[in-house]
Amino acid sequence: MDLIYFLIDFILHIDVHLAELVAEYGVWVYAILFLILFCETGLVVTPFLPGDSLLFVAGALASLETNDLNVHMMVVLMLIAAIVGDAVNYTIGRLFGEKLFSNPNSKIFRRSYLDKTHQFYEKHGGKTIILARFVPIVRTFAPFVAGMGHMSYRHFAAYNVIGALLWVLLFTYAGYFFGTIPMVQDNLKLLIVGIIVVSILPGVIEIIRHKRAAARAAK
């Protein structure tokens, strides 16, 4: 339970925690950001990590004159982390996907996460790799499911790079350009919660629609 509380606190107060990391570790924070983003996109056991808000807050911190963070270097590193992470995730899904999710009672490899991602694939096809970048949890499982389904790696790689570019550039530079606005600085926590809600909302709506459609079909 302590870990759950820590994660919730870290996500909701990511601006404070990230600022503390920058103050304590300086340029080493690049490596920390790289690792967090790689784990969220590359490991199916860490779908809870806050990719969207992390990118936005990192961009906002880079805009402050009190920090030595270079937003352009940060973007390059985050792009590499996102692209390599998805590629690793795809490979894991291709090699071990069925085995990892063979236990229906698993607390870590939950079948519901795969079902949610499959719904996206049914509607959007290969473009799911791009769109999933903006939907937490689905973002982590989309490349994994692509690997399980033996999607052509050439097609996957193209979607992977496009999705990473859109996602990293949008959130990081949005934080960088809006982070200096006093109103944004004063309401950063509220904005982070808003980013999380907006990110999750499309997935929730899609699940509700799918369940209603299934209920109508059952009748």
Curated annotation (Swiss-Prot):
Tell me which parts of the chain lie in the Cytoplasmic compartment: 1-24, 94-160, 209-219
Question: Entry's InterPro entries?
Answer: DedA-like, VTT_dom
Tree of life domain: Bacteria
Tell me the keywords, alphabetical order: Cell inner membrane, Cell membrane, Membrane, Transmembrane, Transmembrane helix
rRNA processing in keyword set: no
Residues that span the membrane, as ranges: 25-45, 73-93, 161-181, 188-208
Q: Which GO terms describe its cellular component?
A: plasma membrane
The residues exposed to the Periplasmic compartment are 46-72, 182-187
Main site of residence? membrane
Which compartments does it reside in? Cell inner membrane
Indicate yes or no for the key word Protein biosynthesis.
no
Q: How does it sit in the membrane?
A: Multi-pass membrane protein
Which PANTHER family does the protein's record reference? INNER MEMBRANE PROTEIN DEDA-RELATED, TRANSMEMBRANE PROTEIN
Q: Which family does it belong to?
A: Belongs to the DedA family.
Function per UniProt = Could be involved in undecaprenyl phosphate (UndP) transport and recycling. When expressed in B.subtilis uptA-ykoX double mutant, confers high-level resistance to the amphomycin derivative MX2401, which binds UndP in the outer leaflet of the cytoplasmic membrane and prevents its transport across the membrane and its recycling.
Q: What is this protein called?
A: Protein DedA
